[in-house]
């Protein structure tokens, strides 16, 4: 994929902050549009099903699930992490993805690892919502990202002084 100099620069910055490869970063007009494309691909590859998410979220994080033809399954939130409680997660049925939302910028690697394990054991993907902590991701002990897909928002109300944008 051909990138402009500015796109390559942002991909390099995101990669350096997260310990990932710049080639793995894709810029989008809004993070929710990147989420929509990812959920549409999940639907195309895995078929109809559910995405585990939480009520403590924004409608812009749920709309892409619905637009892609998937169904949100609202889950219990952990008091300690403000994300889906991995112990309470019902991973049965037609689960296609689990959203690890780092609410308030809380990135708990151990809790995310447990959530990733539950998702993967169910044959689902772990989708990481880093809208509140752009440039940070949950990682395993070796420093590798735990999520299969990670979204970062550059929206006006987020951490960066931009009007629009996001990265997948």
Report each predicted region and the residues it spans:
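Conserved PLP-anchoring active-site segment centered on the Schiff-base-forming lysine
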Residues: 38-92
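Active-site phosphate-binding strand-loop segment of PLP-dependent enzymes
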Residues: 80-168
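A generic structural signal for well-ordered alpha-helical segments
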Residues: 15, 65, 117-119
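Hydrophobic anchor at the start of a short beta-strand
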Residues: 25, 72, 126
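Conserved N-terminal alpha-helix of the aminotransferase class I/II PLP-enzyme fold
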Residues: 1-33, 41, 56
């Amino acid at each position: 994929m051909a990138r402009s100099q500015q796109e390559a620069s942002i991909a390099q910055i995101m990669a350096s902050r997260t310990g990932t490869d710049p080639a793995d970063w894709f810029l989008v007009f809004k993070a929710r549009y990147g989420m929509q494309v990812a959920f549409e691909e999940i639907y195309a590859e895995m078929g109809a099903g559910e995405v585990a998410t939480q009520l403590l979220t924004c409608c812009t994080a749920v709309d892409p699930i619905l637009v892609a033809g998937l169904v949100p399954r609202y889950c219990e939130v952990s008091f300690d992490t403000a994300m889906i409680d991995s112990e309470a997660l019902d991973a049965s049925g037609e689960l296609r993805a689990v959203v690890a939302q780092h609410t308030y910028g809380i990135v708990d690697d151990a809790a995310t690892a447990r959530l990733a394990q539950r998702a993967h054991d169910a044959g689902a993907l772990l989708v990481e919502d880093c809208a509140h902590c752009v440039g940070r991701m949950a990682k395993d002990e070796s420093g590798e990202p735990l999520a299969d897909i990670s979204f970062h928002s550059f929206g006006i109300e987020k951490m960066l002084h931009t009007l629009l944008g996001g990265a997948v």
